[in-house]
Amino acid sequence: MEELQRYFEIDRFRQQCFIYPFLFQEYIYALAHYYALNGSIFYETMENFGYDNKSSSLIVKRLITRMHRQNRLIISINDSNQNRFIGHGKNLYTQTVSEGFAVIMEIPFSLQLVFSFEEKEITKSHNLRSIHSIFPFFEDKLSHLNHVSHILIPYPAHLEILVQILRSCIQDAPSLHLLRFFLHDYQNSNSLKARKKSIFVCSKENRRFFLFLYNIHVYECESVFVFLRKQSFHLRSTSFRTVLERTHFYGKIEHLVVVLRNDFQKTLWMFKDPFMHYVRYQGNSLLASKGTHLRMKKWKSYLVHFWQSHFYLWSQPNRIHINQLYNHSFYFMSYLLSVRQNSSAVRSQMLENSFLIDTSIKKFETLVPTIPLIGLLAKAKFCNVFGHPISKPARADSSDSDIISRFGRIYRNLSHYYSGSSKKQTLYRIKYILRLSCARTLARKHKSTARAFLKELGSPFLEEFLMEEEQVLSLIFPRTPSPSYRSHRERIWFLDIICINILTNHV
């Protein structure tokens, strides 16, 4: 790792980074194994060659040689029983080399970003682009805005677009050819043709490789916001120079002037709205503004034309809806978000006259999506589709403590993730489902009924393991009661929830 850093540190001022020779280095694949990238498939093959679960540059060289010399007609034949090395086929070839390729490709981008911040001595302005800024945006900004547009960042229409994006950053022809080989190999696989899904979601074996490509793609799509912010507010963003700088980017902007009435400077007034906010979590993004509906339509038109003209992305403009916040709810980060208006009447007395003043206060609400969450529990066999708890036969062979610990951990994870919700009714229902499902699983193991089991051990026996997180924290760190304590405990955002997505991962 230090050798790689020294190499890129010397060459960081040049755009060309020749990373192809690193694919033949042993420590690259040891580093990839350290990150737990497909270790089982790779090291299962190493055992067949007698290398005792160790990476070898000789194996890598053989793989690359066979990738260039292989006959696809022979590989497509089902001869996995005759030769396990060939039997792994494309999985072995692509996964083994692409896992090291992904690690190598991440290093120059991360180092360029770090060196750029050090050279320009930027004050913490880049933290505004951190994913942790989503929570302050929800609490402080969203309730003061009027319109919101939920945008799903489109996937690239052609794989060559991904290669062209990296080509402007890393001008290493062998690495780009290898990347092109990986992408077309995955695209031509039978599993991808059957599923008819995007290449970013087709493979579960090499998530790091496709996650890196997707992040580069999303970063490229978001570059327009960095450019407009830099031109409008003169915010010097160093990451714009190192990561977002592309070949002929300003030429693309000049060509875009034709769409915006041939005068780019005069159209910047549309983007100087200080109340325009953009946030993104994974592939979903929100564009919110305090301006009028017409201004939001201009932003929508601009993004659609920009993505289609310069990135060849079809974003389906008919699916980008502009809604008013006070009468619309939307899903984001597995939450159901909304802004409600609470009306209240205040009587004012002045001398002998009294006035009745109607006030309207906007309140930001975060709700737990009940139906999707119950559907997730039903898929995991904790309840049926109607939310009625059922036993978990797969856990009946475990010990009682393991079963209770398993159910308690699931509820605590759910409670931890949805600690930012305004109302806890759905969490109480989830707690009831898991608690009764745990009791029925234990009763099935002991050949009894759930009622008899709870009567024998008592309800507090399960309550101890299904205790809410706030109650655990209050026992560890007792707090004195205060008028603001009630409002504080209603909604708590934990920063580590960004690492998981409840509705996309199995419980």
Curated annotation (Swiss-Prot):
Q: What does this protein do?
A: Usually encoded in the trnK tRNA gene intron. Probably assists in splicing its own and other chloroplast group II introns.
Primary place of residence?
Answer: plastid
Q: What is the lineage of its organism?
A: Eukaryota, Viridiplantae, Streptophyta, Embryophyta, Tracheophyta
**Gene it is expressed from:** matK
Q: Which UniProt keywords apply?
A: Chloroplast, mRNA processing, Plastid, RNA-binding, tRNA processing
Q: Which GO-annotated molecular functions does the record name?
A: RNA binding
Give the GO biological process terms.
mRNA processing; RNA splicing; tRNA processing
Domain of life, per UniProt, equals: Eukaryota
Give the GO cellular component terms, alphabetically: chloroplast
The molecule here is called Maturase K
Stated family: Belongs to the intron maturase 2 family. MatK subfamily.
User: Where does this polypeptide localize?
Assistant: Plastid, Chloroplast
